[in-house]
């Protein structure tokens, strides 16, 4: 027997549907993602902490879930909003259906609502705070919870989702034919600051010969330098980058020491802040796997995976920082490089998961910068 569910936005808009997850109440910022596939990766991406994800593609759950496609050890999204869930998933890799997977992990989710209407509302009004409620329904309680949510501006979530202990990562990409993970020869020592790192980012680094040491977000830079890394990686993550003063000061020290540094997503924003720029909260953010980005150095246009609600303000970039990539959707900054240090970053997700890997060569660029520094 299905349970009722509602989504209530802070402006008072109510969507009624049915529960396809756990019963309960969950609050967060409601955003929309335009990817047609990769819902498992989206739900387990730490960058979605405190966000409820609306998937615009109407049929979600077609291929079920498996043990190999998680991007973290737990679900970080605050909730899931979909139009329709197929009754029977179909994939040779499927191990469990969407409702059972969500219920086991305690994720509140709603289906049967007009996601096109919701997406238009979010596009026109911007991301909204909201509340998902399933099981026993109380609209007023849900509305009150939505309006009490403080929003992501000023919220440091990197320290919330980060690992609590240091660990090693040496596992490469999954070879589906062999049903095994690639093991490469490890030539470079990389320290990865975990602000909410995705597993497939670590796999992309390991596949290129990086022996990765993952450290908590607030690890003192002196400890990182004592490891004598060939390079430092600044990971993706959720929330507002500006409150992460511990990360900004650490990155400033890495820049001063000329340590090869590569940042993705939140790591990109933190590198910009460390260089002296500012960031801004976006109205709707970028969430999807079809975003065109131009490489300003070569003019090439690439289709990228994106997941961020904050952006670097290009007008505040200092003279020693050049713009390398720009969004062709809205002109926002997508990449920077320092002219006086071996440090660069990209706003989107070169590892995709889900999405295209047009920007994957940025990992090769990082490896090349470490090789040059060692020579």
Curated annotation (Swiss-Prot):
The answer to whether keyword Ribosomal protein applies is no
Q: Where is this region: CPSase?
A: 1-185
Alphabetized Gene3D superfamilies for the sequence = 3.40.50.880, Carbamoyl-phosphate synthase small subunit, N-terminal domain
What reaction does this catalyse?
hydrogencarbonate + L-glutamine + 2 ATP + H2O = carbamoyl phosphate + L-glutamate + 2 ADP + phosphate + 2 H(+)
Enzyme's top EC category: ligase
Active-site feature positions: 265 (nucleophile), 349, 351
Q: What pathway is it annotated to?
A: Amino-acid biosynthesis; L-arginine biosynthesis; carbamoyl phosphate from bicarbonate: step 1/1; Pyrimidine metabolism; UMP biosynthesis via de novo pathway; (S)-dihydroorotate from bicarbonate: step 1/3
* Residue span(s) of domain Glutamine amidotransferase type-1: 189-375
Q: Which GO terms describe its cellular component?
A: carbamoyl-phosphate synthase complex; cytoplasm
**GO BP, one annotated term:** L-arginine biosynthetic process
Q: Where does L-glutamine bind?
A: 47, 237, 239, 266, 269, 307, 309-310
Q: Which family does it belong to?
A: Belongs to the CarA family.
Subunit organization: Composed of two chains; the small (or glutamine) chain promotes the hydrolysis of glutamine to ammonia, which is used by the large (or ammonia) chain to synthesize carbamoyl phosphate. Tetramer of heterodimers (alpha,beta)4.
Known function: Small subunit of the glutamine-dependent carbamoyl phosphate synthetase (CPSase). CPSase catalyzes the formation of carbamoyl phosphate from the ammonia moiety of glutamine, carbonate, and phosphate donated by ATP, constituting the first step of 2 biosynthetic pathways, one leading to arginine and/or urea and the other to pyrimidine nucleotides. The small subunit (glutamine amidotransferase) binds and cleaves glutamine to supply the large subunit with the substrate ammonia.
UniProt cross-references to NCBIfam families, sorted A to Z: CPSaseIIsmall, PRK12838.1
Which named protein is this?
Carbamoyl phosphate synthase small chain
Name the gene that codes for it: carA
């Amino acid at each position: 027997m299905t349970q009722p569910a509602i989504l209530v936005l802070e402006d008072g808009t109510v969507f009624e549907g049915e529960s396809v997850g756990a019963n309960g109440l969950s609050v967060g910022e409601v955003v929309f993602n335009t990817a047609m596939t990769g819902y498992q990766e989206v739900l387990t991406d730490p960058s979605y902490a405190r966000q409820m994800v609306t998937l615009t593609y109407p049929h979600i759950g077609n291929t079920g879930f498996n043990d190999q496609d998680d991007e973290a050890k737990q679900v970080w999204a605050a909730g899931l909003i979909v139009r329709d869930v197929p009754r029977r998933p179909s994939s040779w890799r499927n191990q469990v259906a969407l409702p059972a997977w969500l219920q086991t992990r305690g994720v509140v989710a709603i289906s049967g609502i007009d996601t096109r209407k919701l997406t238009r509302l979010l596009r026109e009004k911007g991301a909204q705070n909201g509340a998902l409620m399933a099981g026993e329904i109380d609209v007023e309680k849900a509305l009150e919870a939505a309006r009490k949510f403080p929003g992501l501006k000023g919220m440091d979530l990197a320290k919330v989702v980060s690992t609590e202990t240091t660990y090693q990562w040496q596992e490469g990409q999954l070879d589906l034919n062999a049903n095994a993970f690639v093991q490469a020869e490890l030539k470079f020592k990389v320290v990865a600051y975990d602000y909410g790192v995705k597993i497939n980012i670590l796999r992309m680094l390991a596949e290129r010969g990086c022996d990765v040491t993952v450290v908590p977000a607030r690890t003192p830079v002196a400890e990182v330098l004592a490891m004598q890394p060939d390079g430092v990686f600044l990971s993706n993550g959720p929330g507002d980058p500006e409150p992460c003063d511990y990360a900004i000061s650490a990155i400033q020290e890495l820049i001063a020491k000329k340590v090869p540094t590569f940042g993705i997503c939140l790591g990109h924003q933190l590198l910009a802040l460390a260089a002296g720029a500012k960031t801004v909260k976006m109205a709707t953010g970028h969430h999807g796997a079809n975003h065109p980005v131009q490489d300003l150095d070569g003019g090439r246009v690439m289709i990228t995976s994106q997941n961020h609600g904050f952006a670097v303000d290009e007008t505040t970039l200092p003279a020693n920082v050049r713009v390398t990539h720009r969004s062709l959707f809205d002109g926002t900054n997508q990449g920077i490089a320092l002219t006086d240090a071996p440090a660069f970053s990209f706003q989107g997700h070169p590892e995709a998961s889900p999405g295209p890997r047009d920007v994957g060569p940025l990992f090769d660029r990082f490896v090349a910068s470490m090789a040059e520094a060692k020579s």
